Amino acid sequence: VLLLAQMSSRGNLLTPNYRDEVIAKGTTNDGVLGFIGNGARPEELGQLREKVGDGKLIWTPGVNLAVGDGEMGQRYGHPAEAVNAGSDCIIVGSGIHRASNPAEMAKKYSQVSWDALLERD
């Protein structure tokens, strides 16, 4: 089970109280493998990592090599910044499926995130 702790889209309904409750329940439950974090805000992702520790995974949407705002209110941060802030797995959508060569772009995301992981550890 992955719990939604943060969202990167503008205007989302998650409050700090919600986030704290999710983290409190998720860190004490062995059935929870990890949390969904905010890839658009590395500082928030780093705070999530501090709160959940190294025993839980953080999966991170909201990353794109083209940092900025999306068409439907989503915000994107750079995948390397997300990994350096504590993300264990980046979730990439439009950055790959809208590319002219999706396979090549997937390799690029893989390399960028792998390089960041090597820098982090």
What are these regions, as identified by a protein language model?
Residues 1-57, 65-68:
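Conserved anion-binding
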Residues 54-56, 86-92:
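A short pocket-lining beta-strand/turn micro-motif at the edge of beta-sheets
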Residues 23-26, 57-58, 80-83, 112-114:
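Short, surface-exposed linear patches
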Residues 46-48, 67-88, 104-108:
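Catalytic cores of alpha/beta
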Residues 16, 20, 42, 76, ...:
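Electropositive phosphate-/nucleotide-binding environments in soluble metabolic enzymes
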Residues 60-63, 92-95:
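Glycine-rich beta-strand-to-loop/alpha-helix junction loops that act as flexible
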Residues 81-86, 94-121:
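C-terminal helical cap(s) of enzyme catalytic domains, especially alpha/beta-barrels
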